[in-house]
């Protein structure tokens, strides 16, 4: 905590501050730029360090109603069930509308389609009786993808070219993890015919690709990768180790077979220097 504020920092070195009511009041990025949020009974004003402002209003569910920023005005509309029905944008008098559809009677809150600014159906989703998505497509059936949920717990995905990829899963530390991908290699599925194992924390331990080449991984107590060995167990094995900053999610040194790269940062996590030493 800082004063009466709660502070959250992520592994991207972004910092979020919340007030005593749990409202986000500041965002700070690694380059020390910040955005502040000020709340009133009427609206929320978001201000950047450069003085640029974005103002929005919310309903009682904290869903956006209006937004204005630098010549752009946006209005959001909802039905009686709080479902987003439309977004209207007005930029210098040019007005566009986008609509959202909910056509599944069994799951009336599930999004089934989007009507774009030209009045054309841009996207369509369908679901099975269990509420799982079974198909996705864009206008005129482009990028049509089908999903089948198999009795053994695996999932089969058929892309728009008719290629089928099968995903097998395992529950690791309470989280569903992919343990095998089987199918024809394609730009959309570069990891076809690969297998994966995980440690007790659910972190990736090994990956075996479609050529049988194994990559192994090790982590520190913070869950950060400290060692990765490619082509493990072969004469071509290549190991990369990483030394991490004790409190920030930033590398201090990355050691590869032919070089060591070292980094220095200031107290806010901004990179001060990067040096490369040949080995």
Name each model-derived stretch.
Residues 1-279:
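Extended charged/polar low-complexity repeat regions
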């Amino acid at each position: 905590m800082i004063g009466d504020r709660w502070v959250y920092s992520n592994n991207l070195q972004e910092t979020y501050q919340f007030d005593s009511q749990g409202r986000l009041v500041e965002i700070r990025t690694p380059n020390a730029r910040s955005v502040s949020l000020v709340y009133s009974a009427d609206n929320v004003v978001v201000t950047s360090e450069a003085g640029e402002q974005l103002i929005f209003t919310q309903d009682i569910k904290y869903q956006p109603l209006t937004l204005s920023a630098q010549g752009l005005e946006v209005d959001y509309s909802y039905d009686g069930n709080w479902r987003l029905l439309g977004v209207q944008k007005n930029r210098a008098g040019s007005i566009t509308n986008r609509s959202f559809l909910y056509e599944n009677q069994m799951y009336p809150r599930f999004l089934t389609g989007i009507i774009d600014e030209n009045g054309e159906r841009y996207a369509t989703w369908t679901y099975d009786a269990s509420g799982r998505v079974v198909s996705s497509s864009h206008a005129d059936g482009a990028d049509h993808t089908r999903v089948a949920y198999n009795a053994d717990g695996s999932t089969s995905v058929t892309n728009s070219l008719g290629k089928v990829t099968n995903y097998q899963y395992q529950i690791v530390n309470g989280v569903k993890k992919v343990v095998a991908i089987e199918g024809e290699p394609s730009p959309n599925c570069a990891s076809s015919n690969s297998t994966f194992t995980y440690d007790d924390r659910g972190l990736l331990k090994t990956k075996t690709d479609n050529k049988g080449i194994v990559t192994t991984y090790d982590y520190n107590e913070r869950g950060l990768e400290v060692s990765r060995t490619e082509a493990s167990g072969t004469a071509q094995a290549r190991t990369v180790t990483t030394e991490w900053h004790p409190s920030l999610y930033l590398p201090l040194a990355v050691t590869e077979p032919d070089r060591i790269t070292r980094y220095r940062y200031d107290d806010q996590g901004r990179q001060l220097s990067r040096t490369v030493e040949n080995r």
